[in-house]
Amino acid sequence: MLDKIWYRSKPNLLSRVLQPISLVFIDIANKRKIKQQLKQYKSKIPIIVVGNISVGGTGKTPVVRMLAQQYLAQDKKPAIISRGYGAKADNYPFEVTSGTLATQCGDEPAMLFDALQAQVPIVIAPERVQAVKYIEKNFPDTDIIMSDDGLQHYKLARDKEIVVVDAIRMFGNKLCLPAGPLREPIERLKEVDQIIVIGNCSDKDKELLKNYKNVTYAKVVATEFVNILTAKKVAKTEFNHQNAIAIAGIGNPTKFFKTLEESAINITAKKVFKDHHKFTQSDFEGIDSDITVVMTYKDAIKCKNFAKANWWYLDIALDINV
């Protein structure tokens, strides 16, 4: 319901009614920001925060993955910190290892660890400062730390801020919670170092973005399909015009389905779950065992223990237009 209210070009009646609450939200958020900045922790290791000013999935994690791969290619030693949304670790800070389950560390850290083939230390903690201090102590030769989300976590000083924007949703009605989808007023974009817009913007939105510096456009590119059970990789054309069921438990499933359609797969059914859904075998009851199942990388990480031979995830990369 809120999506229908938030993602209109102009505020509707309900958004107007909620605006006074939004003003209270902004006031509380500003006071919290000032309070956190007074006790801000500054690491000797450079820190890049990759975040957003709106709720929901915008593509932060693929950007973090891309940056980590770039640093590795330059023979640098990056590390990643995350809140670990939905994580249930016994203690924090918690380092992700090869035996860590997504339920312990959260979906995104588990996916990043797998995608980066354990080459990058990944540490989670609700208080990101704890994660940074853990890296300083245990990985002192780290060249750079990337924070997956955490733009509004002002207890941690940062050397660079990158905001990721979904080109389809953009900033909705441009109002703050609960009247709109923004965590901070849109003016916050004037303070960040870089804005990465993922997807195809309308001409109107491109005009809006001209008000901000260092705007980079990117698009999600399907690279290959990976078998969840065997890790076998096949070309993205492997399933052209074949029937498949698409599964998505992410913040913005529409983007995933669109990418699949662009890959010429014949999607016969779509099953959508809430973001960070904890998958079990029962979620797949009623699905014909002979039909191909395709899902996101993030969802696949949670289905490895009960995956079937014809279950695949679509891996992606970002094509950056600098």
Swiss-Prot record:
Its EC number is 2.7.1.130. ATP binds at residues 54-61. InterPro entries: LpxK, P-loop_NTPase. It catalyses: a lipid A disaccharide + ATP = a lipid IVA + ADP + H(+). GO terms for molecular function: ATP binding; tetraacyldisaccharide 4'-kinase activity. The keyword Transcription does not apply. One of its GO terms (cellular component) is plasma membrane. Pathway: Glycolipid biosynthesis; lipid IV(A) biosynthesis; lipid IV(A) from (3R)-3-hydroxytetradecanoyl-[acyl-carrier-protein] and UDP-N-acetyl-alpha-D-glucosamine: step 6/6. It comes from the Bacteria. GO terms for biological process: lipid A biosynthetic process; lipopolysaccharide core region biosynthetic process. The keyword Kinase applies. Keywords: ATP-binding, Kinase, Lipid A biosynthesis, Lipid biosynthesis, Lipid metabolism, Nucleotide-binding, Transferase. Transfers the gamma-phosphate of ATP to the 4'-position of a tetraacyldisaccharide 1-phosphate intermediate (termed DS-1-P) to form tetraacyldisaccharide 1,4'-bis-phosphate (lipid IVA). Belongs to the LpxK family. This is Tetraacyldisaccharide 4'-kinase. It comes from Francisella tularensis subsp. tularensis (strain SCHU S4 / Schu 4).
